[in-house]
Amino acid sequence: MSLLSDLINLNLSDTTEKIIAEYIWVGGSGVDLRSKARTLSGPVNDPSKLPKWNYDGSSTGQAPGKDSEVILWPQAIFKDPFRRGNNILVICDTYTPSGKPIPTNKRHAAAKIFSHPDVAAEEPWFGIEQEYTLLQKDIHWPIGMALGGFPGPQGPYYCGTGAEKAFGRDIVDSHYKACLYAGINISGINAEVMPGQWEFQVGPSIGISAGDELWVARYILERITEIAGVVLSLDPKPIPGDWNGAGAHTNYSTKSMRNDGGYEVIKQAIEKLEKRHNEHIAAYGEGNERRLTGRHETADISTFSWGVANRGASI
C-alpha cells in the first residue's frame, strides 16, 4: 500500500477527538453538487448543532461578484464512507446573509410543504429510481462502447451479467455499499437497458428525507466515479439513436393511497396531475424532450397517459 493510500485511510480517532464535516450543497445549475470540508471539535449527530458556513456564490453561478456571500445551513447528517470514523457528510441548503433562500434552494419550499400538518399526516412515501450513465473520461462515450462505435443492440444488458453485457459493476457495488454505510435508505441497484447505464433506488423514504438521501447518494456516486476516473452523467439522453435514455422515476404514495380503497385515491391524484402536465414537465429538468419521445419505454412529452404495468405511460 502506498503512503498516499495510508494517509487517505488514516484513522483520526486514535489521535484526536476532532472530526471532518463535508458540507454539500446544490450548485448554480440546479444539478451540480459542490462541497467543502471543515474541522469540528468533536462528533455531532444533530444538524442544528452544526455551525452555518459561507462560500463564494459568484464562483458557483449563485451570486454576483459584488455581493457573492452565500450562507450554508446544515439540514441533514450522514456518515462519511470515505473518511469513516466519526466524520460526516452534511446536506445543506443555501441562503442570502439576511436569511432568504436563494433561487436554487428548492429544499426550503419543499420542507415547508412537508412540515404542513395535513401533509405530515399523510406520511408521503417516495421511492426514487435514479438512472445514470458511466462515460469514459476523455471521450465522454459510455463505458463498454468503443469510440464512435456501438455494441450489439439493446436486449442483453438490462440486469445482465458477464464481461460483454455489464460494464462498471465495481463502481456500482462500491456505491451501493457506501450508501448503506452512510445511512441512506438505498433499496437496490440494477444494470439498465443501455450499456454503461445503471440505476439505484432510494426509498421508500418519507417527505424531505427522500430528497436529502437522493442528493447524498448522487454526491457519493460523483466521488466514487471521480476516484475511478470515469464521468457520471444524468443526461436524459446521453447517446442519440436507438438507445434508452435515463431518468429518475418517482414512486409515490400517501397513507390514504396505501389504505383500503386507495386505488380510487390514486386515480383522483392522477386526474389532478393530468391538468397540470405541461407545468410539471417544465419543472422536471432540461433535455427531457430528447428522452420522452414515445419510444424506448417512454411517453411522448406532450401527451399525458397512465396505466398499470405500462412502461410507455407517463404514470
From Swiss-Prot:
Q: Which SUPFAM superfamilies match?
A: Glutamine synthetase, N-terminal domain (SSF54368), Glutamine synthetase/guanido kinase (SSF55931)
GS catalytic domain spans which residues? 106-315
Concerning Gene3D superfamilies, the annotation shows: Glutamine synthetase, N-terminal domain (3.10.20.70), Glutamine synthetase/guanido kinase, catalytic domain (3.30.590.10)
Write down the SMART domains for this protein, in alphabetical order: Gln-synt_C (SM01230)
Q: Which PROSITE patterns does this entry report, sorted A to Z?
A: GLNA_1, GLNA_ATP, GS_BETA_GRASP, GS_CATALYTIC
- Indicate the segments forming the GS beta-grasp domain, all copies: 19-99
Question: What is an annotated GO biological process for this record, any one?
Answer: glutamine biosynthetic process
Cite the EC number: 6.3.1.2
In terms of superkingdom, the source organism counts as Eukaryota
* Quaternary data: Homooctamer.
**The keyword Transcription is assigned to this record:** no
Q: What is this protein called?
A: Glutamine synthetase nodule isozyme
Where, subcellularly, is it found?
Cytoplasm
**Catalysed conversion reaction:** L-glutamate + NH4(+) + ATP = L-glutamine + ADP + phosphate + H(+)
Q: What coarse category fits the chief subcellular location reported for this protein?
A: cytoplasm
Query: Which family is it part of?
Result: Belongs to the glutamine synthetase family.
* Keywords assigned by UniProt, alphabetized: ATP-binding, Cytoplasm, Ligase, Nitrogen fixation, Nucleotide-binding
Keyword Ribosomal protein assigned to the entry: answer is no
Native source organism of the sequence: Lupinus angustifolius (Narrow-leaved blue lupine)
Q: Which GO terms describe its molecular function?
A: ATP binding; glutamine synthetase activity
List the coiled-coil residues.
Answer: none
Q: Name one GO cellular component term.
A: cytoplasm
